[in-house]
Amino acid sequence: MDFRPRQPVVLREMLLSFSNHCYTILVTNKCEEQRRWFVLVYKLPPEPTRLRASVWRKLRAAGAVYLQNGVAALPADATGERAMRGAAQEVREFSGTAHLLRGEAVGHEAALVGAFGEARDAEYAEVLSKCRDFHAELEKERAAGKFTFAELEENEEDLDKLGAWLRKVELRDRFGAPSAQEARAAVLACREDLEAFAASVYEAADHGSASSASSGP
């Protein structure tokens, strides 16, 4: 798997001051309304590759965007700080180097925010794809007449996983990606489709019970 970022985002004109293994970004034209960011700059040994994969997964789970190889960014909030400090600690435990930066972007911040939106849209697209698969599976069960409680339970588990996946993406979605509402609506449609399938399962069960009763001694 390639852990390099797809498109770098440039943060420029920053002055760095060193303090206790962390850098603080000081921007000359500071504005109180300016959004603040954490930027983690790290380097790991080339081998084994699983170390890089582990850090990449941790940062990706937090919703970080890679500005370039070994440079990741998150909004400077409590969630972002926990994720960045945890990743930095893991890098050091893997005999790598890590510097955590906190500050403001001077220019091009819209591109940085846009990169977060693109990353979340890609994840929402995966949710939408799984929703289509979910509907297709229910249609296959209907066509085969498999209106059983076993099939219902299996599809309920799939829907629970789909809902949990959506919630994880929503937690990473700091800026309201364009596809968010579409993904929520798609998961809701899956739930409604499952309820309709459940009604068919109950109807089939009731019909089977009635048939057994009428054919009894």
Regions found by a protein language model. Name each.
Residues 10, 14-142, 164-167, 171, ...:
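Positively charged, polar, low-complexity stretches
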Residues 113-117, 148-153:
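Helix-loop elements that line ligand-binding/catalytic pockets
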Residues 122, 126-129, 150, 157, ...:
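Alpha-helix boundary/N-cap detector
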Residues 139-140, 144, 151-155:
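Non-catalytic alpha-helical scaffolds and adjoining flexible linkers that form interface surfaces
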Residues 159-217:
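Glycine-rich, aromatic-bearing surface loops/beta-hairpins
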